[in-house]
Regions:
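Conserved HGGG/HGGXW glycine-rich cap/lid loop of the alpha/beta-hydrolase fold
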Residues: 2-40, 62-63
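Active-site signature of alpha/beta-hydrolase-fold catalytic machinery across serine-
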Residues: 18, 79-83
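Gly/Ala-rich beta-loop-alpha elbow adjacent to hydrolase catalytic centers
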Residues: 68-73, 77
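Active-site loop/oxyanion-hole signature of alpha/beta-hydrolase fold enzymes
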Residues: 32-66, 82, 106-110
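Flexible "cap/lid" loop of the alpha/beta hydrolase fold
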Residues: 82, 86-88, 92-126, 150-151, ...
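Active-site nucleophile elbow and catalytic-triad environment of alpha/beta-hydrolase enzymes
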Residues: 142-161
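Conserved loop-alpha-helix segment in the C-terminal half of the alpha/beta-hydrolase fold
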Residues: 177-204, 208, 216-224
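Short beta-strand/loop motif that positions the catalytic acidic residue
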Residues: 164, 170-172
Length: 228
């Protein structure tokens, strides 16, 4: 199966290299999606540009792909399901959840000179970054790509109710499946409360398992995709 890999904030497509290699060895065709503004040098990219890049990958896939979104990019994966509900086999959210209609895509941190730079490690102390040593943290911060303001502040627009019929799996790294279910039951993740086929998978890692547990993440993704 084609497995589209959509990276979260501050990350380029190469963050998936080890996961992609493992997926290929398991018989799948991984496709890291090149997002405008995350590795191409552009600071003027918009949320719509990134959605268009994901949709282009969906349309180019052989058969129905599985779309994997990490962290904030869970919303990109979900926007793809909204735009192509009949063309996507499954959506997988890794370490995050989709934003609701009308919400900003990623208004988490302050913009500086039109971009949202990596804020340093203080906001991620605890389970998020517990499995990243000092060397890994330095490398991550040095490679982090400032997110264009037009992406970070873009407003999420969802319109097709058929998105709720697309199967969804949630990979739970720095939180547990039980916590995710509690948040959904509490109304904190309204989009997932309406998904008809929703499953949860535990992964013992921090927020960036593509860095710290790539083989394990690849196995979970392959299992979510089912027989190739």
């Amino acid at each position: 199966m084609d497995i589209l890999l959509v990276a979260g904030l501050w990350l380029g497509g190469s963050v998936w290299d080890d996961v992609a290699a493992a997926l290929r060895s398991l018989g799948h065709r991984p496709v890291p999606v090149a997002l405008p503004g995350q590795g191409d040098g552009s600071t003027s990219a918009t949320l719509e540009d990134q959605v268009a890049a994901v949709l282009a990958a969906v349309d180019a896939a052989s058969g129905k792909p599985m779309v994997v979104g990490h962290s904030a990019a869970c919303t990109l994966a979900w926007l793809a399901a909204d735009a192509r509900p009949d063309k996507i086999a499954k959506v997988v959210f890794v370490g995050g959840f989709p934003a609701a209609d009308g919400k900003p895509y990623a208004g988490f941190f302050e913009l500086r000179d039109g971009v949202m730079p990596f804020p340093g490690w203080d906001p991620f102390e605890g389970p998020d970054a517990a499995d990243l040593d000092e060397e890994a943290r330095r490398a991550f911060a040095a490679a982090a790509i400032p997110v264009p303001g037009g992406v970070a502040t873009g407003i999420v627009r969802l319109s097709d109710e058929r998105r709720f019929a697309v199967p969804v799996a949630v990979v739970c790294p720095e939180f547990t499946p039980a916590q995710a279910k509690e948040w959904i039951d509490a109304g904190d993740i309204p989009e997932l409360a309406r998904v008809g086929d929703l499953s949860f998978v535990d992964l013992d890692s921090g927020h960036w398992p593509m860095h710290t547990k790539p083989a394990e993440l690849a196995r979970l993704l392959a299992a979510a995709a089912g027989p190739n």
